[in-house]
């Protein structure tokens, strides 16, 4: 019953957050701040991880298909498919759940335990709307940018690996593989998935932060729970969205 009441409380919190802001000027100021803090500040980690993973994927695939029967361009083709379909959206979302989710949960949780949220409620401000909506929208607006950067840098990492001689890849066959049977829907599929993930990360983290009771220790527990819970929900959403959109 606790899980059901959790879901119910989260629905109530979402309904309270997703309303028109009282003061638009304030809302846009917050939105820009959150886009910068949650989105732009995550660019560097997305780029670093994507380059390395793209390189590793290309090297591992080239070692796995060292059979003379398999054409070399499959390395580029498979690297592209893995990065476009799964890595840039789902694996990135898991990494962002750790970075962004814990940030949101601890920030809102700290405001709760220092009684700032109670002060807002007394002043007649819709605290959920004021605190949560800019974070949710900010992440949902900027996550496609992160995904596109991740795809680009991941594939650049693969190209970088194809220039190394020991792997048996040639840049020309790798680049032919990158263009082979390209389906642009996969990029849209990843972007749509990532927006859903952004909603999951921000709403779950906000819920755990908003409902903290206690002190600093509970804030830490809440951000841990937020990361664990949103990771599970991301993987569940991944399965559901893949079934709906690709089969």
What residue ranges belong to the model's regions?
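Short cytoplasmic-facing helical segments at TM-TM junctions of multi-pass membrane proteins
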Residues: 108-133, 216-219
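Short, small-residue-biased leader/transition segments that mark boundaries at the very start
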Residues: 1-8
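Membrane-interfacial helix-loop-helix connectors in multipass membrane proteins
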Residues: 60-84, 152-195, 203-222, 244-247
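Membrane-interface helix starts
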Residues: 22-48
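Start (N-cap) of specific transmembrane helices in multi-pass transporter permeases
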Residues: 126-147, 222, 226
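Hydrophobic alpha-helical transmembrane segments of multi-pass membrane transport/permease proteins
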Residues: 43-61, 240
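Loop-to-helix entry region at the N-terminal start of transmembrane alpha-helices
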Residues: 41, 45, 49, 70-104, ...
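Hydrophobic alpha-helical transmembrane segments of integral membrane proteins
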Residues: 129-137, 227-247
């Amino acid at each position: 019953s606790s899980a059901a009441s959790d879901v119910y409380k989260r629905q109530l919190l979402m309904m309270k957050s997703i309303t028109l802001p009282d003061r638009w000027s304030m809302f846009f100021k917050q939105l820009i701040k959150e886009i910068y803090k949650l989105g732009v500040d995550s660019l560097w980690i997305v780029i670093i991880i994507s380059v390395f993973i793209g390189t590793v994927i290309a090297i591992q695939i080239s070692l796995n298909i060292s059979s003379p029967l398999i054409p070399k361009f499959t390395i580029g083709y498979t690297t592209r498919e893995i990065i476009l379909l799964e890595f840039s959206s789902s694996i990135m979302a898991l990494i962002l759940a750790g970075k962004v989710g814990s940030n949101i949960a601890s920030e809102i949780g700290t405001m709760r335990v220092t009684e700032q949220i109670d002060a807002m409620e007394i002043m007649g401000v819709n605290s959920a709307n004021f605190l949560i909506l800019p974070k949710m929208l900010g992440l949902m607006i900027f996550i496609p940018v992160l995904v596109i950067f991740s795809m680009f840098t991941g594939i650049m990492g693969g190209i970088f690996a194809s220039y190394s001689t020991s792997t048996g890849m040639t840049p020309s066959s790798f680049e032919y593989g990158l263009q082979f049977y390209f389906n642009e829907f996969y990029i849209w599929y990843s972007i749509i998935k990532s927006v859903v993930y952004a909603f999951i990360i921000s709403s779950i983290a906000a819920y755990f932060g908003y409902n903290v009771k206690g002190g600093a220790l509970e804030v830490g527990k809440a951000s841990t729970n937020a990361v664990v819970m949103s990771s599970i929900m991301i993987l569940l959403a991944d399965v559901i969205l893949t079934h709906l959109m690709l089969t």
